[in-house]
């Protein structure tokens, strides 16, 4: 969130900190400030000018010769190429000697033979990003209101004598997604209470219920919904103070109605939405769940297909807005709007978050609803917004609101004690200091003997347990003020064997090129049973927050598939992920579920990316098979991993294998079924999942390091003709069993199938490597070992030596 330093100061009478000091102080209390930008650092000598005359440049069709009055005694001539410059305008002028962002210094110059003594500026040339410049001025200079005095400092007028704090708001601090919330935080830091925003004093006329009625079909998804009416309005540009506040917050001004809703959202953290009342097409608003495949064209001009479960605002027939996300083009406020229905509501955070993610539509409103908000500030925000629209548009504020209120206000009281606070924090804070801290935070404190009962304001919905209270005390008291104390007893550090093994697995997989993923343990009912290692029953939550998170997972792979799909939708086409996490299986009765640790992985796209030396290599079954085999070897497991062809729902029937270790099936590896890949917009994708406990319990052998051989090795090539259903693993096993102690390596270097070999036959070629670490091998030794291998292959596999 971008926070204006000057706007923060408006909440306090005497502000003691510079912008840099404020950023450091906020960071110390737990909200990270990613940067502080002084807007006027590269601006100098910029004033308001009046264009006295404007005529076409005699030698340049696209240039204008303007006579401009600034703060100097005489007007100056400025050559300007903006298409919208005209006589009579109040404009921003960078005088000769002025400095602008990017290191640009304005000099007296000649343009096509005409002298230019300065520059008429656009907002972008003053440092505003193009995405926040009003569309009317996107291609030209910015025209100031006519009442602005000529010659005044334009830097001050535009609010550029300011600093912007870039705040990284964590999900638990949604209260700081508003200027009021920031002011509360800052007030606690500087020991001052912030002033409350005051709304314009506008008289009301009429009754809102004469204009519209409201019906809410699902109160759980919409606990509060209200409409405030403003009529006889005139749509025009917002005043300069409002435009500059929005632009500095990263929001583009539109008009005096839309800008007020954005301003109130910034001020209170409460999204509002404005409907053109005459376009609604009904005198009744119905808030309901969307119908499957219902469509709406949103304000950005995109036609969006809704899903059942998305909350929509309708006129009783068709949607006019996606609740908490974005309004519909159907009821958009335009220059012809005369009556506005202003919406203020509280929507379920899980519902809005789900809709925002599924529609790939993230807005300032959805961000605030998704993170959660104070359900009791909406009336104040709606009243302020309605009054401000009436004041800025010359409209009539209609009396009252039409509302449906199903909120339940519960007082949030948490108990702790001074003794516990000091014992846990390691401090010696006095009761007086505690009282001061909670007063600064705006919390109500009641002292009963040693007990402290704290009533938490509704704006801090993130505070629910005693630990949260202790954190607040530590934050405001100052983390740097808490004394450093050594542990009372010594502890012996060290990792257990299983911890070491897990670290080895993570390091190996990351070294192999996979990235660690962390996904939810909660999933949907459908995903809970997909691709599981076991057929055990799933565990359902008794009170799930949403259908998407109603069950505990029995497999990690479905979540990795969703993660891969999410990445590919954002043009990250080559994905390699792994996750080590817990899956859950139901037990009989009310017993706790069985928890099992699994390791899962997924690869899709290219394994090797193309460059000037090589072509891209797509992922395949053997890439992932090699990674899994390497993992088993890295753990020092003595037994060999066996691969058994199998079939599993949602995996490719011809490219799926179960993993068998020490006679026990411990997992699977395979390609996703093409139908699953198509459903998630994936290319060829391979996955595996292994029971971690089986890996940890497998017999290990100690790693013994051998010196580098002093004697040369000898090799023999064998080409075998075998049945088509004879696999490499079976051949390799026979060779190992009969190759003797001199055989140190087996390498498959060729596979051939063709009509010339005969029906259902294939040829495999191997290189066998022999080595004796104590002497030089002789031909007789190698031939003897090779003969034993050949005899065994002929006897056990009916192989023909070619």
From Swiss-Prot:
Domain FDX-ACB: 709-802
PROSITE patterns documented for this protein: B5, FDX_ACB, TRBD
Chain residues that bind Mg(2+): 462, 468, 471-472
Superkingdom to which the source organism belongs: Bacteria
A GO MF term: catalytic activity, acting on a protein
Keyword annotations: Aminoacyl-tRNA synthetase, ATP-binding, Cytoplasm, Ligase, Magnesium, Metal-binding, Nucleotide-binding, Protein biosynthesis, RNA-binding, tRNA-binding
Reaction equations catalysed: tRNA(Phe) + L-phenylalanine + ATP = L-phenylalanyl-tRNA(Phe) + AMP + diphosphate + H(+)
Cofactor: binding details: Binds 2 magnesium ions per tetramer.
SUPFAM superfamilies hit by this protein: Anticodon-binding domain of PheRS, Class II aaRS and biotin synthetases, Nucleic acid-binding proteins, PheT/TilS domain, Putative DNA-binding domain
Enzyme Commission identifier(s): 6.1.1.20
Gene Ontology BP term (one): phenylalanyl-tRNA aminoacylation
Disulfide bonds: none
Domain B5: 409-484
Cofactor(s) this protein cannot do without: Mg(2+)
UniProt subcellular location: Cytoplasm
Annotated HAMAP family: Phe_tRNA_synth_beta1
Family: Belongs to the phenylalanyl-tRNA synthetase beta subunit family. Type 1 subfamily.
Subunit structure: Tetramer of two alpha and two beta subunits.
Name used for this protein in its record: Phenylalanine--tRNA ligase beta subunit
High-level lineage: Bacteria, Bacillati, Bacillota, Bacilli, Bacillales
Gene (UniProt): pheT
